[in-house]
From Swiss-Prot:
S-S bonds: none
High-level lineage: Eukaryota, Viridiplantae, Streptophyta, Embryophyta, Tracheophyta
This protein's record includes keyword Secreted: yes
Full protein name: Alpha-amylase inhibitor
Cellular component aspect of the GO annotation: extracellular region
Keyword Iron: no
Length: 25
């Protein structure tokens, strides 16, 4: 989530390495 894009990120970001963006705003 630290490397995540804002909550506007799409599930694609998960594949990019953003695993827990779903659990964070």
């Amino acid at each position: 989530s630290e490397d995540c894009t804002p909550w506007t990120a799409t599930p694609i970001t998960v594949l990019a390495g953003c695993r827990d963006y779903v659990g964070e705003q």
